[in-house]
Amino acid sequence: MVICYLNPQNLRTRKMEKLSKIGRYQFLAEPFHCDFTNHLFMGHLGNHMLNAADFHSNERGYGMNYLNTINKTWVLSRLAIEMYDMPKAYEKFYVETWVDSVMKYFTSRNFKVVNEEGHVYGYGKSIWAMIDMDTRQPTDIFAVREGLINEYIETSYECPIEKFSRVKVTGEEELLRSINTYYNDVDVNGHITSVKYIEHLLDLWDLDWYRTHFIKRFEIAYVAEAHHGDQLNFYREHREIERENDFNFKITKTTSDNTEVETCRCRVLFNSIL
């Protein structure tokens, strides 16, 4: 299997050409993107994965650079990240990414995080929708460039983590925190950026917790968009009573008219490290 080795620093406009189905992009765990344990923040890893997805799709002709010219865009619907360990400060690592299935309105994209020696830090899975920028409704992926994305589906490269789980809330969830949203929370599509939900949610635990716990798996499923000025409310309950380190979350937004609407659901699974 051939993997395309490309550095995002050297991307440039090029004639349309058939590239490999798998992209590989180098990143650096910059120290100001690492936590007090000297490891990369989960939020920054998620951001690197989204950047890799953007590089990969743009190079192959169905990314944001082209979609924006026809008033369409990609939006992240679901993301799951499962890690064995995290890159340390100043370590170089690669995010590999590939599309493993496509439907009319959604596509499935996988990730692998690995260093130069082949050590695997972890994997990710994601679901994306293509939407119309005016109506905000899903649009036909196969109608873009005569279904060009079909030429880049890779089904044999391994991504050995669990599929997305169902995040249930029972009505017994506890409100832990409410926060306001500001300029730095908003992305290019005009809504609260995907990674900000991850960062705000992981702030719900203090440093003492992170001294003895490692984020093994993080899942997020987006339900509705939140926008600048909305208040975000974080509700938590244990996923299973016997698993004290496994949590389900419901995040809602409170709008200017005091309406509370669910925006996403999350799961966070920790491993004890002591």
Predicted features along the sequence, with ranges:
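Hot-dog-fold acyl-thioester-processing enzymes
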Residues: R14-L76, Y123-K125, D132-F214
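Acidic/His-leaning functional-site neighborhoods
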Residues: E173, R177-R267
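N-terminal amphipathic/basic-hydrophobic helices that include classical n-h-c signal peptides
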Residues: M1-K15
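HotDog/MaoC-like acyl-thioester-processing domains
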Residues: R14-Y25, A80-S165, Y222, A226-H228, ...
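Exposed loop/turn and edge beta-strand positions of beta-sandwich/beta-sheet ligand-binding modules
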Residues: S77, T107, K216
